[in-house]
Amino acid sequence: MVIQKNWQELIKPNKLQVSAGDDPKRVATVVAEPLERGFGTTLGNSLRRVLLSSLQGAAVTSVQIDGVLHEFSSIPGVREDVTDIVLNIKTIAIRSQTDQPKRMTLRKTGPGLVTAGDIGAVGDIQILNPDLVICTLDDGAEIRMEFTVATGKGYVPADRNRPEDAPIGLIPVDALFSPVTKVSYRVETTREGQDLDKDKLTMTVETNGAVSPEDALAYAARIIQDQLQVFVNFEEPRKEEAAPLAPQLPFNPALLKKVDELELSVRSANCLKNDNIVYIGDLIQKSEGEMLRTPNFGRKSLNEIKEVLAGMGLHLGMDVPGWPPENIEDLAKRFEEHY
């Protein structure tokens, strides 16, 4: 028996459709089809669990409030008690560019609302919901807080966020590090050719904005892939490689490389795929204006692609004589060793 048939003959999704919600940075629906019967539930459930439990994120882990010794206190001139303030602090959405704990401060004088946007800026930290109300100050009231922000995964209860040498007045906070706030999936029947019993997996992912839904799904898939690798206890037999003479081409053989090998971000790669840009030779003939007219393709993706192409000595808007060549897939395989 040829062992490769165990996985090579299974149907794999040939379509991955991404539909952004009202806020593309926070909500998206991804459809994968066709899948072998039963794989929709297997993959959907696994991805959902990993999305909710295993992605790294940032959260407030403790807070100190001037004049407050514990969370059951009240603050003169502040309408909310400390317990309510701590509950509001738990919902601050944060993006952190560092693994190290950081301190952030807030100071404000009333009257008025105190919001997450009043927290002093720190270079590596970004508040994603600045309009979140933390508390309300009466006229003449003043409040000063100091927050500790850390990175982690999953849910960590407050008692585990209290340092052994915690000073008096430090209030630990329940930390929900996961940037993914909600995941749902459904499995429907679809067809592949004459087969009517294949699965169609639809996943809706919501995040707090620290990571896009598309990237969150990609990270979750990578985690599952990495965890399963230990179970693969064999090496696949190598195919015998033929060594035909490579024909002379009127262009750089590197243009035969596929764009999905460029290690682009998930968003950039999906935009190229949706625009039927398969090879680097297809890509470099596009102008910047043409790329920016591609749906969901923005300036950030454009700069990323320009930087990658520059590293190869290429740029957008190039004229490539003889492109596309005949039998391009065959040529790409024959020139793999050359790029």
Swiss-Prot record:
Keywords: DNA-directed RNA polymerase, Nucleotidyltransferase, Transcription, Transferase. Residues 1-235 are annotated as: Alpha N-terminal domain (alpha-NTD). It comes from the Bacteria. It catalyses: RNA(n) + a ribonucleoside 5'-triphosphate = RNA(n+1) + diphosphate. One of its GO terms (molecular function) is DNA binding. DNA-dependent RNA polymerase catalyzes the transcription of DNA into RNA using the four ribonucleoside triphosphates as substrates. NCBIfam families: PRK05182.1-2 (NF003513), PRK05182.2-5 (NF003519), rpoA (TIGR02027). This is DNA-directed RNA polymerase subunit alpha. The gene is rpoA.
